[in-house]
Amino acid sequence: MAMNGLSKMAVAAATALLLVLTIVPGAVAVTYTIEWTTGVDYSGWATGKTFRVGDILEFKYGSSHTVDVVDKAGYDGCDASSSTENHSDGDTKIDLKTVGINYFICSTPGHCRTNGGMKLAVNVVAGSAGPPATPTPPSSTPGTPTTPESPPSGGSPTPTTPTPGAGSTSPPPPPKASGASKGVMSYVLVGVSMVLGYGLWM
């Protein structure tokens, strides 16, 4: 009888572990690294990406730039006077906490309005149980043309030349690993747990 109770506890524990591991992929936050500089089409970069509550935007930028969290009016008018956050440390991490469109601009005069502007709007949705999408950070080396992530079929992309800013003389760092590999690993753990759980039933 004691063995039967022990087996039931093991099955219950394996089932609980399986349930937790099934939920984990949706709970893994993705960090999107953004090379925050002039001459980048940030609206194009954000298109097609799914940002979720809990994800992190990591802005990397030179000393001539800022990251300001603004409302739609501040975004549209490139006005940071009513910003809720103002950063100038060169490596700013912002947790996406609210569902809806989140707005970011550079408040350095001329940067928000020039060459498409240093402004970013991301639509944030509630978390889900699926694995996160692979983020692709925008990057550009000052003085080097930038192109869209995927050029339109039948035509060639039109490059733009960014204006070099103070403190932005080195090329951007390579993209960071995405959260997608974490999601795949979670599914591997779920599979292993299922096999182990099946062994307990036998």
From Swiss-Prot:
Lipidation (GPI-anchor amidated serine): 178
UniProt xrefs under InterPro entries: Cupredoxin (IPR008972), Phytocyanin-like (IPR039391), Phytocyanin_dom (IPR003245)
GO MF: electron transfer activity; metal ion binding
Propeptide: 179-202
SUPFAM superfamilies the UniProt entry points to: Cupredoxins
Domain annotation Phytocyanin: ranges: 30-126
Main location: membrane
Compartment annotation: Cell membrane
Binding site for Cu cation: 65, 106, 111, 118
Gene Ontology terms: cellular component: plasma membrane; plasmodesma; side of membrane
Keyword Secreted on entry: no
Highest taxon, organism lineage: Eukaryota
Signal peptide: 1-29
Any Pfam family the entry gives: Cu_bind_like
Bilayer topology: Lipid-anchor; GPI-anchor
Keywords, alphabetical: Cell membrane, Copper, Electron transport, Glycoprotein, GPI-anchor, Lipoprotein, Membrane, Metal-binding, Signal, Transport
Gene3D superfamilies per the UniProt record, alphabetical: Cupredoxins - blue copper proteins
Compositionally biased intervals (Low complexity): 141-169
Region described as Disordered: spans on this chain: 129-181
Glycosylation positions in this chain: 86
Function comment: Probably acts as an electron carrier involved in oxygen activation and/or lignin formation.
Protein name: Uclacyanin-2
